[in-house]
Structures are given as C-alpha cells and as structure tokens.
Swiss-Prot record:
The keyword Ribonucleoprotein applies. The gene is rpmF2. PANTHER family: 50S RIBOSOMAL PROTEIN L32 (PTHR35534), LARGE RIBOSOMAL SUBUNIT PROTEIN BL32 (PTHR35534:SF1). This is Large ribosomal subunit protein bL32B. Keywords: Ribonucleoprotein, Ribosomal protein. One of its GO terms (cellular component) is large ribosomal subunit. One of its GO terms (molecular function) is structural constituent of ribosome. The keyword Mitochondrion does not apply. Belongs to the bacterial ribosomal protein bL32 family. It comes from the Bacteria. InterPro entries: Ribosomal_bL32 (IPR002677), Ribosomal_bL32_bact (IPR044957), Ribosomal_zn-bd (IPR011332).
C-alpha cells in the first residue's frame, strides 16, 4: 500500500481544496414579468432582456 513520504501541510491541503467550494447562483428579480431568474439566463416565461425569445414557454 502506498504511504506518503511526508506529512501534507495545512497550507498545501487548503490550496488544493480551494476549488471545492459550493457556488451560490446569482438570482435577480425580473421587473418585466415579476419573476426571479438567474443572471444572464432566459426567464421561465421565455423572456430575455425584456423581449420574448422562446415561443412555447409556459404561461
């Protein structure tokens, strides 16, 4: 079985783990239709930047 030659320091462990964070999605209020949506994404009703971009979106 493989055994590490040296103890991994706290700094090395933490540097390696910096990429394992959970990212909170950016949510903004869309005043055009009164819904919340993710930034730079189409709303659930099919609007983006105040214009209808998806024809068959729900409601």
């Amino acid at each position: 079985m493989a055994v590490p030659a040296r103890k991994t320091s706290k700094a090395k462990k933490r540097l390696r783990r910096t990429h394992q964070t959970v990212v909170k999605p950016e949510i903004s209020f869309d005043e055009a239709n009164g819904d919340y949506r993710r930034s730079h994404h189409v709303s659930l009703k099919g609007y983006y930047n105040g214009k209808k971009v998806i024809k068959g979106a729900s409601k």
